[in-house]
Amino acid sequence: MTRTRTVKKEKISVASEIDRVEERKLQCKNSLERAEFRKRKQQLSDDDRLALEDEMTILNERVEKYEKDLQVLRGENRRNMMLSVALLAISALFYYTFIY
């Protein structure tokens, strides 16, 4: 299962991966906001409050993880863009040197 999963990940573009991670981060932030709203507005027992705080801690950790993933993906996307620009410049140089 791990092998097929890595093969599938290799076929996904960096931009679509960024979109997917941003969507997951947004879902976590929305869940976190709902949990914070529930904590403020409802009278919760100690057990419910602790469970809600644990859930909020987990959601905060996920948001931080997604932010780190986004930072890595954006760096990879930037590197790919620079590589594309360099290849375009080299192609243009060869075209104007040998053909034009």
UniProtKB/Swiss-Prot annotation:
The intrachain disulfides are none
Q: Name one GO cellular component term.
A: membrane
Origin superkingdom: Eukaryota
Keywords annotated in UniProt: Coiled coil, Membrane, Transmembrane, Transmembrane helix
InterPro entries reported for this sequence:
CCDC-167
> Which residue windows are coiled coil?
14-81
Q: Where are the transmembrane segments?
A: 82-99
Q: Does the keyword Membrane apply?
A: yes
Source organism of this protein record? Danio rerio (Zebrafish)
Tell me the membrane topology, using the record's own terms: Single-pass membrane protein
- Tell me where it resides: Membrane
Please give the name of this protein.
Answer: Coiled-coil domain-containing protein 167
Q: What Pfam families does the record tag this protein with?
A: CCDC-167
